[in-house]
Regions:
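C-terminal amphipathic helix plus adjacent low-complexity
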Residues: 64-66, 82, 86, 90-107, ...
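Short acidic loop-to-helix transition motifs that present clustered carboxylates
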Residues: 124-128, 147-148
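Catalytic binding pocket for nucleotide-activated donors in carbohydrate/polymer assembly enzymes
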Residues: 134, 143-225
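A short, aliphatic-rich alpha-helical micro-motif
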Residues: 3, 131-134
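Active-site-proximal region of nucleotide-activated glycan assembly enzymes
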Residues: 1-43
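Conserved catalytic-core segment of nucleotide-activated headgroup transferases in glycan assembly
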Residues: 33-126, 133-135
Length: 246
């Protein structure tokens, strides 16, 4: 149980799979497609494909909260960086994050990563500038065991697919559910070794990744991820079922 005073839990079939209901004291409310939906940002920047084309170095990126960058994540990311001619872009989600940035660099140094391969940016104050950061890299790397949610929605909206890890519970499967709803199962790794192998595969096929840009945005906009009207209707129907059952 998450909380003793919570009766229902909103989920989908990708987050809590059949047979796992017994692990929850709450009554599970399964949404038809996905447990969450995002409204299209008002100031959605253009996708700049030229940045990726002009980059001589393949660039990975993650705009997730630094707290989600686990020791396991750093080890796998370091392995990727140490075995490719690539770099990694990270961005803080809080102000005055110098100590956090220093701590991150130290963790990568312990894995023998050249610090010049990592760029860590400060928080930006408006959404448009934040979203424009996705134009700086080729592929988003998701964190694990706790993946990004909003940043994953943002990534595909900005034409950048994200590589995520298959989880073993609700919280660790959010990226999996998002990619399944987009039909991007190839971007779901089964374990740390598969994550590494997939990252190398996409690194070697950078042209394919770059070409996904505008098409991926349109696909996301027409998927359950951004269909807030359909999600609202489904959510209302679920609430009405709960109300009428009492």
């Amino acid at each position: 149980a998450l909380r003793s005073n919570m009766d229902y839990l909103i989920t989908d079939e990708n987050l809590i799979k059949k047979g796992e209901e017994k692990f929850y004291s709450e009554k599970l409310i399964y949404m038809p497609d996905i447990w969450n939906s995002l409204s299209k940002p008002k100031n959605l920047p253009e996708i700049d494909l030229n940045i990726c084309k002009n980059n001589k170095t393949f660039t990975f990126g993650s705009l997730s909260n630094f707290q989600k960058i686990s020791v396991e994540t750093i080890k796998v990311w370091s392995n990727i960086l140490n075995n490719t001619n690539s770099k990694l872009i990270l961005k803080s989600s809080i102000n005055n994050s110098n100590d956090l940035k220093k701590n991150l660099y130290e963790k990568f140094l312990k894995e023998n990563v050249n610090p010049e391969k990592i760029e860590v940016f400060d928080r930006v104050e408006n959404q448009k500038n934040h979203l424009e950061f996705y134009n700086k890299f080729n592929l988003t790397l998701d964190t694990f065991p706790y993946p990004g949610v909003t940043t994953s929605f943002e990534s595909v909206l900005m034409g950048k697919p994200f590589l995520t890890m298959r989880g073993n519970n609700f919280n660790s499967r959010c990226g999996e559910s998002i990619n399944i709803n987009l039909g991007l199962k190839d971007f779901i790794a089964t374990d740390e070794n598969d994550y590494y192998e997939k990252a190398l595969k996409f690194y070697k096929d950078s042209n394919k990744i770059s070409k996904m840009g505008q098409q991926l945005r349109e696909h996301a906009l027409n998927s359950p991820l951004l269909d807030v009207k359909k999600f609202s209707k489904n959510f209302y129907d679920k609430l009405y079922e709960i109300y009428t059952s009492h």
